[in-house]
């Protein structure tokens, strides 16, 4: 049986975590983002989508695929 291809989503940090609540900073770290304009490709799951929604003012979705 062939493996099912997992969907991915690429996010870029566009906002600084300075003077943001610690929960938002922790969410960015959880997404693997720690510097401005860094990009990470993550597995597209409901939990990742929720994390992106929590810091949507600090990140940008670059690619969904």
Curated annotation (Swiss-Prot):
It comes from the Bacteria. SUPFAM superfamilies: Ribosomal protein L30p/L7e (SSF55129). Coiled coil: none annotated. One of its GO terms (molecular function) is structural constituent of ribosome. Keywords: Ribonucleoprotein, Ribosomal protein. It holds the Pfam family Ribosomal_L30. Part of the 50S ribosomal subunit. This is Large ribosomal subunit protein uL30.
């Amino acid at each position: 049986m062939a493996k099912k291809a997992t969907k991915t989503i690429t996010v870029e940090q566009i906002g600084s975590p300075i003077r943001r609540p610690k929960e938002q900073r922790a969410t960015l770290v959880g997404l693997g983002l720690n510097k401005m304009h860094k990009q990470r490709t993550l597995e597209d799951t409901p939990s990742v989508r929720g994390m992106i929604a929590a810091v949507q003012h600090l990140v940008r979705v670059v690619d969904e695929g």
